[in-house]
Amino acid sequence: MRYRPLYNIALALLMIVGLAGCKREGGSGSDPNPPEPVPQMPTIKIPRGELRAVWMTTAWELDWPHGNYNPKVQRELYTDRLDLLRKYHFNAVFFQVRPMGDAFYDSKYEPWSKYITGQRGQDPGYDVLDFMIKEAHERGIEFHAWINPYRIETRPNNKKAFGPLHPSIPRGWVWDLEKIRMYNPALPEVRQRLLDIIDELLTKYPGIDGIHFDDYFYPEQSQGAFDDAADYKKYGSEYSTITDFRIDNVNKMVSSVSQMLRTKHPGVTFSISPGSNADHNLKDLYADTRHWCKNGWLDLIIPQLYQATNPTSQSGFYQRLSWFCQFSYKTPLAVGHAAYRVGEEGFSTNADEISKQIAIARKDSRVYGSIYYRLQDLVDNRGGILDRLSKEYPTVMPLPCFSRTTKAVSPVRDLSYKDGRLTWVTTGKTRSVIYFTSSVDQEAVVLDITEGSSLEVSRKGYYCVTALNEDNLQSKISEVLEL
């Protein structure tokens, strides 16, 4: 008991010291040596990734190979086209690999395309897709495999006979209409065949970045009448109308492709490019784009907005874009532009119209870029379109990330400068995007996208780097380096 007073005195002293410490930490100004403030690192705004793509049409040899059946000439033509796209900072090509119930590769389901050799079923003597995919990737260009899900053959009218049906395609799966031969969309066997074809394609060529459908579903009325009453009787008992039955046949196809891709090929982007008229899509082609987007079946929707920006027209570019932006829900959207209409009366005498459309699209955060129909019109610089795009696309740009399964990317570290070069350290299998701005008040531009970890630079200003994975997901920016 005799030590209690000393204990109380010690406790009181501790409380006084503690209160004094709290007072100093509260910032009363009583500390004669306050800690130095931590310097704020500069930060810069970087642009969002943007799709810059082109459709490369092989049906009727429109864009490739133009009647050139020599493998060496074909390869040179293709790489020349890729070099042009790289020069103008494109980052994706949508190449038509199945234009007419055929294949640009050795398939057990369908014959070699006649558009490679001039003869349906003839082996071209080289692996066309392997070459094309590798050459595109070497130039930093994604390769999306464009497939027509139902079309097998076309003809001008029924006075001309269709060719013999390939033995791999059962006769009972096919409609022969006035102007088109196509798979019957009502048949479960047809849906399964399409799944098998896509799975085979992606298994053979894992480097493919995307699967793409265009706007061909049920046939246009102008292509000929079809009779599916027997199919409706056999498969349609749960539907109140034959229209609902047809719409759901296409829905089932789109849904099953989406599910298969996400299960077996999760890194592959699934996109569809419907026509611009939503009523026509639904009532004539039985393509319910709203339903696809609302259910999240697509990674990207690319409406073909081939109209001019007429502010007074209810069917102009702006009005159609507004509709698709509203009813794409959470599905990313890109715009299909009519490069083939540049210089056409009622569209534009030059490429001004395309620039207007790009400007309108870029103002909407739901739009992630552009794709142009078609490649040959760019090659021909129709109406000066390439000259204009060189101003719209002054530097390279990474693509947006459309994948729903990709994991976060580790940022680059140790960004430094010495002897005229930036260097940095990456983690894992990634590319690097290098950004520059002369002022922190201005949005940065992309200097380069590289698999390396250094870049020669000379301009005074601010630099940062992001890591970019194979799904185009970018990391947070590195520290900002001022030179």
Please report, for each region that a protein language model flagged, where it lies by residue.
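Glycine-rich, aromatic-flanked loop segments that form ligand/cofactor-binding clefts
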Residues: 49-53, 90-100, 128-174, 212-214
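Catalytic domains of carbohydrate-active enzymes, especially glycoside hydrolases
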Residues: 76-102
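Substrate-binding cleft of secreted/luminal carbohydrate-active enzymes
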Residues: 299-313, 331-404
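Conserved aromatic anchor
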Residues: 420-428
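Beta-strand-rich modules
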Residues: 457-474
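Extracellular fibronectin type III
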Residues: 471-483
